[in-house]
Amino acid sequence: VKFVTTNEGKVEEAREYLAELTTVEQFDYDYVEIQSDSLADIAAYGAEAAFEAAGGEEPVIVDDSGLFIGGFDGFPGPYSAYVQDTLGVQQVWALVKTLDDRRAAFRGCVAYTDGETTETFEGSVQGELVAPRGTGGFGYDPIFEHAGETFAEMSTEKKNALSHRGRALAKLADWLADRDQ
């Protein structure tokens, strides 16, 4: 399976979940991301485009994820990368810290396609946004707290065991195992 990402950490996480089922190779392809409020639509579109770009012979997976902030009615959601690139985590925290409702969720969707079928698998983790803490992880990890720790304070192993992407990858692994029986 080719995992379409430039993030080696995501590839390693996928390898942990899929090791007994398939090999996972990183595929660096910059597909055009459609604008949609649906993570599943974005990931499925990306997987289908990447499958063609990769030669159409090996299955591919694409993941899309976002931070959904309660006090902002779920924004930035699918637009999280754009907001992070534009404002940065510190500025997002500056906006969020004034909110009464700082509940948040990381939601992710992994899309798989082999050219014949496209399937999507979603995962989420609930938390709260807090002042930045920790030095690990990436993106919004320093401000996303789950069970008393920010994702940036957790070990990679602990974070991956809890993460939205990990939960989606576990569902993909179950589906692949059932399909291959």
Model regions and ranges:
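Anionic-ligand binding patches
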Residues: 2, 9-181
